[in-house]
Amino acid sequence: MILLTGGGTGGHLFPALAVAEELRRRGHPVFYLGAEGGLEARLLPKTPIPHALIPAGKLDRSALRPQEAPKVLQGVLRAQALLRRLRPKAVLSTGGYAGFPGGMAASLLGIPLLLHEQNARLGLANRALAPLAKGLALSVPLALPAPLARKARVVGYPVREVRYPKDEAKRRLGFDPQRPLLLVLGGSQGSLELNERLPPVLKGLPVQVLHQVGERWVERFRPLEGEGYRVEGFVDTPLAMSAADLLLSRAGAGTLAEAAFHGLPAILFPLSPKLDGGAQLANARAYAQAGGAVLGAWDRLSSQILEALEDLEARRRAMARLSPEGAAARLADLLEAFL
């Protein structure tokens, strides 16, 4: 058995699910260890993957929050008990606060631990676990200290490798195949900033819009809907990205990897570095440097959208060159080497 852990948000959960799917396809039994209250608590019951949820205290960027310390300790102890019972041959942690207890428990029990980092810099959980791990898989090349660099390998970001013909995808979503479609994503929880500031900018632009506002914001922003403008709490990402001609979003690693897989150029509004330590800004700059994305500017966003629509083919090619296709298989190969 191979145990996978990580989550809390979609950026950590979805790559682990993609690897789980690949491992199951190869005949390996898998088990998923997630966090109580994380996104996985809602999504895992809808999958065929056996799973358990444990407490997982949130890590702070400067020091462990006193009120979270008991949860962190409890989570590690619960994870240890579970791993002793399941006896997995290897553990993959995709990070996030949900991935720390299982990763630490694997290290304490001497079970081979493989980490996967999604962003253009190591996250807190992976930073803490990396010295203890047997392997470190990266989505993009990172500058690392020599001890970590020796066990690191760039594999890409695992995504659901599903595509649909563009015209078919637009029709399935109820859009005109002959008109460009702008897909707006604010991350798995939605972005209030994008939800509030974007609609006035889009008035009069020659685009259809599929706007994922986040489930908690659906009723508030439902009145935005009209001809060629759809509001959804959650979207089928492979279908939506297959249909879209241009993406406007935050700069989470998962969203960008999926956009690259679909060759979907993007206009990006990364989170403030005060909120995520600069991970999204680093992601956005990497994709912009490659030519597949630009950093959005509210004072000229209308022009940026029009410029992107006029230059779609070149930007599509640049984005597609960053495709993570095969990443789930490469991670599965690394895990099999531990068995």
Curated annotation (Swiss-Prot):
GO terms under cellular component: plasma membrane
Membrane topology of this protein: Peripheral membrane protein
Q: In which pathway does it act?
A: Cell wall biogenesis; peptidoglycan biosynthesis
Q: Which GO terms describe its biological process?
A: carbohydrate metabolic process; cell division; cell wall organization; lipid glycosylation; peptidoglycan biosynthetic process; regulation of cell shape
Show the GO MF annotations: UDP-N-acetyl-D-glucosamine:N-acetylmuramoyl-L-alanyl-D-glutamyl-meso-2,6-diaminopimelyl-D-alanyl-D-alanine-diphosphoundecaprenol 4-beta-N-acetylglucosaminlytransferase activity; undecaprenyldiphospho-muramoylpentapeptide beta-N-acetylglucosaminyltransferase activity
Which PANTHER family has this protein been placed in? GLYCOSYLTRANSFERASE (PTHR21015:SF22), UDP-N-ACETYLGLUCOSAMINE--N-ACETYLMURAMYL-(PENTAPEPTIDE) PYROPHOSPHORYL-UNDECAPRENOL N-ACETYLGLUCOSAMINE TRANSFERASE 1 (PTHR21015)
Family of this protein: Belongs to the glycosyltransferase 28 family. MurG subfamily.
**Name of this protein:** UDP-N-acetylglucosamine--N-acetylmuramyl-(pentapeptide) pyrophosphoryl-undecaprenol N-acetylglucosamine transferase
User: Which lineage ranks, top first, belong to the organism behind this chain?
Assistant: Bacteria, Thermotogati, Deinococcota, Deinococci, Thermales
Query: What is the gene called?
Result: murG
